[in-house]
């Protein structure tokens, strides 16, 4: 329910397409990882100026209206409590999130991205390959190749191991690579986009073309 403090406030809310909130009560979110593009269109909000999102590694995404499309428009991004994010999700970034359908006064129902984690892209190399979560398992071998990295497809169950990870291939800055290396040793690992290659010693290398670094998630 929207609380109106006065006629002027109500009119202002309608003018900007005030959102009444999700159709159901706030529930745990973050079931998938989505690619995010900032909407560059200049028509009035909330019909423009939000984000275009797609299910990472998916050919089509189920949008807020239930239809499956290559990508979906969302009017805005909110946090787990459905408060507006204080800072925008970066263009070409990733978000662990869910798509919800909200009612916007005077407009109708539009998609909203409910976000738990934002990932900022890092790197300047041409992007290719799928999205993967990479974890250093801590296994150390006497002989090479040593398949010590676990690589899992984002939004999927396909899993493999590699004997090496090339982060520098992404063209990221030294500080960004250092953060990515630290993420490899965490429980959640590092999300990266890239491809696999064989090595001369019989090993397998994951060559990252883009790194995604976990960002703070401030809210208003």
Question: Which ranges hold each PLM region?
Answer:
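C-terminal region of N-terminal signal peptides and the immediate post-cleavage residues
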Residues: 16-28
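Bacterial N-terminal signal peptides
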Residues: 6-17
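Positively charged n-region of N-terminal signal peptides that target proteins for export
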Residues: 1-5
């Amino acid at each position: 329910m929207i609380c109106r403090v006065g006629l002027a406030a109500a009119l202002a809310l309608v003018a900007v397409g005030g959102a009444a909130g999700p159709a159901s009560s706030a529930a745990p979110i973050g079931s998938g990882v989505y690619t995010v593009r900032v909407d560059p269109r200049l028509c009035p909000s909330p019909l423009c100026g939000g984000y275009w999102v797609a299910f990472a590694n998916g050919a089509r995404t189920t949008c807020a209206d239930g239809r499956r499309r290559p990508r979906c428009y969302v009017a805005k991004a909110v946090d787990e409590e459905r408060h507006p994010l204080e800072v925008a999700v970066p263009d070409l970034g990733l978000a662990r999130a869910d798509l919800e359908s909200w009612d916007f006064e005077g407009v109708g129902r539009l998609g909203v991205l409910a976000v738990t984690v934002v990932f900022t892209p890092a790197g300047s190399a041409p992007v290719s390959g799928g999205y993967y979560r990479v974890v250093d398992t801590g296994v150390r071998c006497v002989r090479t190749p040593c398949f010590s990295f676990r690589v899992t497809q984002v939004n999927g169950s396909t899993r493999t191991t590699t004997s090496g990870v090339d982060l520098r291939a992404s063209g990221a800055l030294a500080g960004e690579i250092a953060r990515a290396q630290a993420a490899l040793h965490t429980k959640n690992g590092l999300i990266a986009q890239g491809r696999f290659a064989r090595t001369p010693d019989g090993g397998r290398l994951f060559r990252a073309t883009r790194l995604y670094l976990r960002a703070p998630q401030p809210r208003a």
